[in-house]
């Protein structure tokens, strides 16, 4: 069903987020800094409401604005996951903003605007909508990275992200212009009809477009910004960076590859396979020497994007199902891990080295138990959620005949398990360090839910797997 103006229900989540951003700016402008907590609460409510509206949308494909915006089961699944990541990262930031004297109403507004960009990006049906959504998301993220103006690290993180982000946006735009030049259309469905053979110009366009998207998912070789920005940005901001924007970028990566370029699969499959192998290898080996837990999680996220891309490299419906399942489980594991990093405070000051977790099992046994479950899950140890996610992407690769890619993925998982297990060893077997400060209630709730989800997901995986399968079918 295609039309110039889509039914109101199809764009209601985006309209709600846009309206919320305007209202929140007005509240902040009228009430000043004292409105920060109110604006934060309303922003969380807006993100949750947008997620509920997405879930209430009918399970049909709607193409609005002459195909520029697609609302289908795939977009709905990824929007729910991304909005969940955005809402939870805002919940995690409430206590930090007050403790760090960073209670600025602009923070929540920027997260809402970034979430609007994320929703537009996930629903993009042509290259122009893709670029507009990407820039709305990116411009908000550049400011959020440097939100703590009193911190040199935060300012440096924002500047690095801005400079490299601008470069990647330029590459993406150049790739999009090449694809348009060689196909005569920007619409994904139109590109699919015209791009039936891998001409040189088209392949160059795909390379540049994918390079820009690789930057957004922090895949090798466009990962350089990730460790520095993750370490330098405030922890709640890092939690947001590591979840919602990556879900959006991975969604558009999958949509462009599968929907716009189905007849040149072999060309983009080689690119995705190389990026996947390089990301898994770097994520596994570079994290081994890390002492800062945020840098460790940064390299870990690079590796996990490599694992997710294994499913896309397969180029099949099963592969895309694996990608969707992987991203959903990755978001929960990552939010839980960064909750623990946020809770690492002594005498009101944040500590970030792995050694600071020494003996945590004796000083904070429940926090240690939850973090151990998350680390085992990130390592892909059965029967935890992380294992289920890896199983599905590797199975898709094997079914598609990519045996080498699956073997490299398993080896990278084994190597990567070392640094996750080292964290568990330090928590349970080293002499206790000084105890951390008490954990705020909202962090306890996030940690409990993420820990329980990763531990007991294997008992009832069917609903999420079925939802991911239905979403993947919409693209084929």
Swiss-Prot record:
It catalyses: a quinone + NADH + 5 H(+)(in) = a quinol + NAD(+) + 4 H(+)(out). The gene is nuoN. It comes from the Bacteria. Its main location: membrane. It is found in: Cell inner membrane. This is NADH-quinone oxidoreductase subunit N. GO terms for cellular component: plasma membrane. Belongs to the complex I subunit 2 family. Keywords: Cell inner membrane, Cell membrane, Membrane, NAD, Quinone, Translocase, Transmembrane, Transmembrane helix, Transport, Ubiquinone. NDH-1 shuttles electrons from NADH, via FMN and iron-sulfur (Fe-S) centers, to quinones in the respiratory chain. The immediate electron acceptor for the enzyme in this species is believed to be ubiquinone. Couples the redox reaction to proton translocation (for every two electrons transferred, four hydrogen ions are translocated across the cytoplasmic membrane), and thus conserves the redox energy in a proton gradient.
């Amino acid at each position: 069903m295609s039309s110039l103006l889509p039914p109101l229900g199809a764009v209601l989540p985006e309209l709600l987020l846009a309206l919320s951003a305007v209202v929140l700016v007005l509240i902040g402008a009228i009430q000043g800094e004292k409105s920060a907590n109110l604006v934060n609460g309303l922003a969380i409510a807006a993100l949750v409401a947008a997620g509920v509206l997405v879930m209430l949308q009918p399970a049909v494909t709607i193409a609005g604005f002459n195909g520029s915006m697609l609302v289908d089961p795939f977009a709905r699944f990824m929007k729910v996951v991304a909005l969940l990541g955005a809402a939870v990262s805002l919940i995690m930031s409430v206590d930090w903003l007050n403790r760090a004297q960073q209670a600025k109403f602009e923070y929540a507004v920027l997260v809402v605007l970034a979430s609007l960009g994320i929703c537009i990006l996930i629903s993009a049906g042509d290259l122009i909508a893709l670029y507009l959504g990407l820039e709305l998301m990116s411009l908000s993220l550049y400011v959020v990275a440097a939100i703590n103006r009193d911190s040199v690290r935060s300012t440096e993180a924002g500047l690095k992200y801005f400079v490299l982000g601008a470069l990647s946006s330029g590459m993406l735009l150049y790739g999009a212009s090449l694809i348009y030049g060689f196909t005569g259309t920007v619409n994904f469905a139109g590109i699919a009809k015209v791009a039936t053979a891998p001409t040189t110009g088209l392949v160059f366009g795909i390379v540049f477009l994918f390079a820009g998207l690789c930057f957004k998912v922090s895949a090798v070789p466009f990962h350089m910004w990730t460790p520095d920005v993750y370490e330098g940005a405030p922890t709640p901001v890092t939690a947001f960076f590591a979840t919602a924007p990556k879900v959006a970028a991975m969604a558009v990566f999958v949509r462009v590859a599968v929907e716009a370029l189905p007849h040149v699969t072999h060309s983009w499959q080689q690119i995705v396979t190389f990026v996947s192998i390089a990301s898994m290898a770097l994520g596994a080996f570079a994290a081994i020497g890390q002492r800062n837990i945020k840098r460790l999680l940064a390299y870990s996220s690079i590796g996990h994007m490599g694992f997710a891309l294994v499913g896309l490299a397969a180029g099949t419906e099963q592969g895309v199902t694996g990608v969707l399942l992987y991203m959903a489980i990755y978001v929960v594991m990552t939010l839980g891990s960064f909750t623990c990093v946020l809770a690492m405070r002594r005498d009101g000051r944040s500590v970030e080295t792995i050694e600071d977790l020494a003996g945590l099992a004796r000083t904070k046994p429940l926090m240690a138990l939850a973090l151990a479950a998350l680390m085992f899950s990130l390592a892909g140890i059965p029967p935890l959620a992380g294992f289920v996610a890896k199983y599905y992407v590797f199975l898709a690769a094997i079914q598609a005949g990519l045996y080498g890619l699956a073997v490299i993925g398993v080896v990278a998982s084994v190597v990567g398990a070392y640094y996750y297990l080292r964290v568990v060893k330090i928590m349970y077997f080293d002499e206790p360090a000084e105890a951390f400060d008490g954990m705020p209630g909202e962090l306890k709730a996030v940690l409990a839910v993420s820990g329980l989800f990763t531990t007991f997901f294997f008992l009832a995986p069917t609903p999420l797997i079925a939802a991911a399968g239905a979403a993947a079918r919409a693209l084929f």
